[in-house]
Amino acid sequence: MYLDSAKKAELFEKYGKSVKDTGSPESQIALFTFRIAHLTEHLRQNKKDFATERSLKMLVGKRRRMLDYLIKVDIERYRAIIKELGIRR
């Protein structure tokens, strides 16, 4: 599987405050970005997989809402996370 508990723990440790920090916006955005990259690669190979395309659009929307929240709360954390993950705005 592309996303196991070890990979999640690695993402949470790198972008969150600790391995158990699953709720911070940075760790959630990092997880969404990882899943978006995986689904994008899947859709390049399977162009007619419309269910996955819908899932991808929903994930992008969730990440966008989380980024909008982070802008309102702390603009510096927002700038740091988009620079680190390479997200366009």
Curated annotation (Swiss-Prot):
PROSITE patterns: RIBOSOMAL_S15
Stored SMART domains: Ribosomal_S15
GO CC annotations on file: cytosolic small ribosomal subunit
Gene Ontology biological process terms in this record: translation
GO molecular function: rRNA binding; structural constituent of ribosome
InterPro entries named in the record: Ribosomal_uS15, Ribosomal_uS15_bac-type, uS15_NS1_RNA-bd_sf
Keywords: Ribonucleoprotein, Ribosomal protein, RNA-binding, rRNA-binding
SUPFAM superfamilies recorded: S15/NS1 RNA-binding domain (SSF47060)
Subunit description: Part of the 30S ribosomal subunit. Forms a bridge to the 50S subunit in the 70S ribosome, contacting the 23S rRNA.
Family per record: Belongs to the universal ribosomal protein uS15 family.
Family matches, as HAMAP family: Ribosomal_uS15_B
The protein's role, per its UniProt record: One of the primary rRNA binding proteins, it binds directly to 16S rRNA where it helps nucleate assembly of the platform of the 30S subunit by binding and bridging several RNA helices of the 16S rRNA. Forms an intersubunit bridge (bridge B4) with the 23S rRNA of the 50S subunit in the ribosome.
Protein name stated in the entry: Small ribosomal subunit protein uS15
Biological source species: Porphyromonas gingivalis (strain ATCC BAA-308 / W83)
Gene encoding the protein: rpsO
